Regions:
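N-terminal secretory signal peptides and thylakoid transit peptides that target proteins
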Residues: 1-15
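Conserved class I S-adenosyl-L-methionine
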Residues: 51-58
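Class I SAM-dependent transferase core
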Residues: 17-48
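C-terminal substrate-binding/active-site "lid" region of AdoMet-derived donor-dependent transferases
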Residues: 130-180
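Conserved SAM-binding motif I beta-strand of class I
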Residues: 76-81
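S-adenosyl-L-methionine
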Residues: 91-113
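Central antiparallel beta-sheet cores of small beta-barrel/beta-sandwich binding domains
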Residues: 181-293, 299-303
Length: 304
């Protein structure tokens, strides 16, 4: 049975290790190279395409960036590392490999890296450090940017794809940076000769989102809200004045303060013979972000 002294020794050792990790994050991350199989799996999951730029935060000897560029002539790369000696060696290796015109390595803290032009972000760092970088990635990387890690995850941000071979092989994960859907949006749809104004409100945590809308004095919840990079889709079933109980399926893309795409509407047809007959209409749809939240405007007792 463990004694109190042995238990305290374990606690002390764990505390010392945590302190070591914290100091390493503040000063430098000791370089431990990824094994070739993991590197290849990371690159395959990221699938960089011609014209894209990949960034490796904590690039070490450059092996992940090199693997992403080799055999892909249209891909450009950037490695960021806090170890000046490794940066110098990586730039020399890039020239020796004939990649000097497409890749560069810079001596920089990962928290200072410019992520705005990245299409792919690679990371293989301390798990705590990757978690600390998560807010920067979500705030600065473009929607749709692929983030690929080996071994460790990014906390509560659930991956969009996982390559897990089981056994002792580390899992490789990929995330798509989600567009910012959260907030208030307004749009209009023309149905049966009437203009219907939608005042919508979305809540979001990473790629998970939900929302509701108001049309006139009625409110309803959106169903099946999906955010994947810039792409967004959701559905709605709601009674609309002059149209009846209408089914709407929205598909579009979020670009800054606009959301644009198409909506498929299924509208009940006025028929004495078949009350299930529907008229199907597809139309363009454009929403704009707003600071005036119509969803909260007074409703009154007349909800027709």
């Amino acid at each position: 049975m463990p004694t109190r002294r042995s238990f305290l020794s374990l606690v002390t050792a764990a505390t010392a290790w945590h302190a070591l990790v914290a100091r390493a994050q503040e000063r430098f991350s000791p370089f431990v190279g990824s094994n070739p199989d993991s590197v290849q799996r990371m690159v395959e999951l990221a699938a960089p395409r011609s014209g894209e730029t990949v960034i490796d935060l904590g690039s070490g000897d450059g092996r992940i960036v090199f693997a992403a560029l080799e055999g892909r002539p249209g891909v450009r790369g950037l490695g960021v590392d806090i170890n000046a000696e490794l940066v110098q060696k990586s730039n020399a290796a890039a020239k020796a490999k004939g990649l000097g015109d497409r890749v560069r390595f810079v001596h920089q803290n990962a928290f200072d890296a410019d992520l705005g032009r990245a299409d792919v972000i690679f990371m293989w760092l301390f798990p705590e450090l990757m978690r600390l970088l998560r807010p920067k990635i979500l705030a600065q990387a473009r929607p749709g940017t692929r983030v690929v890690t080996s071994t460790w995850d990014l906390g509560t941000w659930q991956p969009d794809a996982v390559d897990d071979l089981g056994g002792t092989a580390p899992a490789v994960r990929k995330w798509l940076v989600p567009a910012r859907l959260e907030g208030a949006w307004d749009w209009e749809l023309q149905l049966r000769g009437r203009t219907h104004r939608f005042s919508a409100l979305f809540e979001q945590r990473m790629q998970q989102a939900e929302g509701a809308t108001r049309v006139g004095n009625r409110r309803e919840i959106f169903q099946n809200v999906i955010v994947r990079g810039e792409a967004v889709q959701f559905s709605l079933r709601m009674t609309l004045s002059g149209a009846g109980y209408t089914q709407l399926a929205f598909v579009g893309r979020v670009r800054g303060d606009t959301m644009e795409g198409t909506v498929d509407a299924a509208i009940p047809m006025a028929s004495d013979d078949d009350d299930t007959a529907m008229e199907h209409v597809r139309m363009p749809w454009l929403a704009r972000r707003t600071t005036t939240i119509g969803y909260f405007a007074p409703t009154g007792t007349n909800i027709s």
